[in-house]
Amino acid sequence: MIIIIKIRINIHIIILTIIIIKGTINLRMSIVNQNKIHITKKQGIIMMMMMMMKILKEIKNLFDLDIMVIHIGMIKFNLVEIVQKVAVIQKVHISHYILEQIDMVDEMIIHDFKHVDDPMVIVKICFLTFLM
């Protein structure tokens, strides 16, 4: 029983890692193309939200929970810091423009989703957990 659970968790961690790597590759491509293709603020926010929702789905599968309640007051960090950590690990330079987009997503999460059991809070915590 314990072995099965460990295998299941390992599979989901691998899937989460793949999603984060794919997201980083997409971010890298947008950095490469930023001089040629203009990404609007709305598109940037939608891209980040879609990536977060994919990760959220994997977290829900991983823990088999409908709602994960987390105390927001205990956690103080933002998505920009997290993405910068990913960039250092992946050796990617992230432009100021893209960091502004991510910061905007972070502000949306803080203002639009104030419930303690909000999925986006879970996503932010998951990001931090997998980067430490």
UniProtKB/Swiss-Prot annotation:
<comment type="function">
    <text>FS800 is likely to have some function in the production or maintenance of the schistosome egg. It may have a function unrelated to eggshell formation.</text>
</comment>
<protein>
    <recommendedName>
        <fullName>Female-specific protein 800</fullName>
    </recommendedName>
</protein>
